[in-house]
């Protein structure tokens, strides 16, 4: 077996991410990140940026029990460091393996970081793992394989209406997303998560390919999870 270490036993650095793309070229409706990522996955597949079947793509819902999710470098922020406290957020992660090299990218249409951004940079700058210890602000990550997500996810956008039926945020102009089985709304099934949902790393690396709702990982597991995937 080939030795992938460099002289002195050090691990070679990951390859550089590709040049940034113009995020404005992709469909984006503010505050509808779940739908933005759904369309983003489709466009990455259509344009040939991802695998033709989208097998290298993952939708990642970020939330927690309290629906208080701190993130940095967010375009919606009014502070210099881009800090926002979301109830939930959704990003796309592309995890690729080629010639023994690992290249994990984050596609976040709401971030001011490069688009795409290297996974390492995004985790370090936007997520800042373990910044909050075991407080109510610790983040959880529901990872769903894109082929499963594109078949299964649905939203009727009712979460964006107040009790009188008025829009809290204006909806996208296109039709709402319906799952292949006819389900019209299951958004809460994806954004609801707790520490009890986190299982052992080995089993989750397998379950992510078959579970409709993916797997839930915590901040401790996050940096290692994608490196365990076969790619």
Curated annotation (Swiss-Prot):
Residues 1-21 are annotated as: Disordered. The keyword Electron transport does not apply. GO terms for molecular function: protein-N-terminal asparagine amidohydrolase activity; protein-N-terminal glutamine amidohydrolase activity. It catalyses: N-terminal L-glutaminyl-[protein] + H2O = N-terminal L-glutamyl-[protein] + NH4(+). GO terms for biological process: defense response to bacterium; positive regulation of camalexin biosynthetic process. Keywords: Hydrolase. Pfam families: Nt_Gln_amidase. InterPro entries: N_Gln_amidohydro_ab_roll_sf, NTAQ1, Prot_N_Gln_amidohydro_ab_roll. The active site is at 33, 89, 108. Disulfide bonds: none annotated. Residues 11-21 have a biased composition (Pro residues). GO terms for cellular component: cytosol; nucleus. PANTHER family: PROTEIN N-TERMINAL GLUTAMINE AMIDOHYDROLASE (PTHR13035:SF0). Mediates the side-chain deamidation of N-terminal glutamine residues to glutamate, an important step in N-end rule pathway of protein degradation. Conversion of the resulting N-terminal glutamine to glutamate renders the protein susceptible to arginylation, polyubiquitination and degradation as specified by the N-end rule. Does not act on substrates with internal or C-terminal glutamine and does not act on non-glutamine residues in any position. Belongs to the NTAQ1 family. Monomer. This is Protein N-terminal glutamine amidohydrolase. It comes from Oryza sativa subsp. indica.
């Amino acid at each position: 077996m080939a030795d992938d270490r460099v002289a002195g036993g050090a691990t070679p650095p990951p390859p550089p991410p590709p040049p940034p793309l113009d995020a404005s070229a992709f469909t984006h409706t503010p505050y509808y990140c779940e739908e933005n990522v759904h369309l983003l996955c489709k466009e990455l597949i259509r344009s040939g940026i991802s695998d033709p079947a989208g097998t290298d793509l993952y939708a990642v819902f970020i939330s927690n029990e309290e629906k208080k999710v701190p993130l940095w470098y967010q375009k919606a922020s009014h502070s210099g460091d881009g800090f926002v406290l979301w109830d939930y957020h959704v990003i796309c992660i592309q995890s690729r393996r080629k010639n023994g090299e690992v290249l994990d990218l984050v596609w976040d249409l709401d971030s001011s970081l490069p688009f795409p951004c290297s996974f390492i940079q995004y985790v370090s700058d936007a997520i800042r793992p373990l910044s909050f210890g075991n407080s109510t602000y610790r983040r959880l990550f529901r990872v769903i394989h894109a082929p499963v997500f594109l078949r299964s996810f649905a939203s009727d956008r009712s979460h964006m209406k107040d009790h009188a039926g008025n829009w809290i945020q204006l909806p996208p102009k296109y039709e709402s997303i319906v799952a292949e089985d006819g389900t019209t709304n299951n958004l809460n099934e994806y954004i609801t998560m707790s520490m009890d949902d986190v299982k052992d790393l080995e089993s989750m690396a397998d379950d992510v390919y078959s579970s409709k709702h993916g797997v839930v990982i915590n901040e401790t597991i996050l940096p290692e999870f994608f490196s365990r995937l076969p790619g």
